[in-house]
Amino acid sequence: VFKNLKKYYLLTAILFFFNFIFAQQNNVALTPPMGWNSYNCYGSAVHEDEVKANADFMAKNLKQFGWQYIVVDFLWAYDNPPGSTVGNPFQSRLPDGSYIPWLRMDQYGRLLPDANKFPSSFGGKGFKLLADYIHSLGLKFGIHVMRGIPRQAVWAKSPVLGTNGITANMIADTSSICPWLNHMYGLDMQKPGAQEYLNSILKLYASWGVDFIKVDDIARPYRSPEIEGYYKAIQNCGRSIALSLSPGETPIRDSAHVKKYANMWRMADDFWDNWEQLLKMFDYSKTWEGVGGPGHWPDFDMMQIGKLSKRGPVGPERYSRFTPDELLTHMSFWCIYRSPLMLGGNLPENRDIENNLITNDEVLAVNQNGLNPKQLYKNDSSMVWVSSMHGSKDMYVGLFNIGVDAHQVNLDLAKLGINGKVTVRDLWKKSDVGIFKKKYSKLINAHGCALLRIKVN
């Protein structure tokens, strides 16, 4: 009766085994990383006390549900003017060729946290004390990194640590500049000293206690030599560090490469609290279907849940513009697809609606314990995704109304390889709906969803 279902279980078990063995190379991100990132609420201007406040909230309210990473996003080396909400402040040059604003940097061309924003870094301590604080809460610490080497280090001809006489100007690719933040040059990885520079910054981050780095301006366009350089530097730094690549969209043609060298990578450009952008994520998800697994995860981007844009970078300060139904769809789809879950809102300002979204253990289990998610069908008004479940014959199913009106979304159990009776459980309500045979149907609001667990009786 269940031949097709048995084949599906066997295939997912085989895929899980080989993905798990592959992931042991760095033993990080064996399940999709779960955490918080400062960008969506603080842009380039987060301060140390705000990072600590979010860490405190996570440790008290979220850690027991699996949330663990606290990530400081970009421009931590830049002294933002008070009240500034400028997202990407460009550097300009003085008559002698030097750069303004000048970023905090050590003698080896390695950026350091700005002490005005991160007072514990004063005296060259870097992020060590902040990381220690976050680790003391039982959490992990991450930072954002722009690809390459600071242009000001190239101008200053900063020596590259670990080399004999090689300076920053000898390893930079001065034709490679990020179009939306001009602080860095790319690295020419064929030049002697380029890998040593990456080795030096990763050893610095490891000495601080960094557990996660998000490298930006590296996945679009896809820069395989530099990606391999960061990977090698992590392998040699003496600490387990997860590697995240940004921005999207990462080319699907490079899926084999990115699976080998990164732990997560962006499928799309920046995602914000807009239904049209959420619809596009459904298309990206189909493109990357079947690629994710232990140690390597396609990433939808940070989650638009909670208080956003307190200091930029997009739109006025606000709670997420998503409706309650859209928030359920947002959270449910990130979970069933097994995308990394990085919260973007300011956690201490969460209301009940936000806390209920991110503390449902049965919903989070779909993200952490699912296997081989795949799209069952999609049309103009409905979409259904299914995931098997590690250690069980049960299945997870997401029913999504992507149309403009409330309507019934149908699940044909035969398409799951099931011909007998099933028990359907509503994961958001944490309650069994009933026993069904052949099909299950639910009336769902426009832009809403149902997240289910299907148990074969």
Specify the residue positions occupied by each region the protein language model found.
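Bacterial Sec-dependent N-terminal signal peptides
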Residues: 1-24
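Structural recognition of the beta-strand scaffold that forms the well-ordered cores
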Residues: 32-38, 68-73, 140-145, 206, ...
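Aromatic-lined carbohydrate-binding/catalytic grooves of carbohydrate-active enzymes
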Residues: 59-133, 137-206, 210-212, 217, ...
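Glycan-recognition surfaces
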Residues: 170-176, 189-190, 196, 240-346
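Carbohydrate-binding surface patches
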Residues: 328, 334-337, 342-344, 378-418
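Catalytic cores of secreted or luminal carbohydrate-active enzymes
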Residues: 329-377
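Solvent-exposed beta-hairpin/edge-strand motifs
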Residues: 414-429
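C-terminal beta-strand-rich structural cap/linker in extracellular carbohydrate-active enzymes
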Residues: 435-457
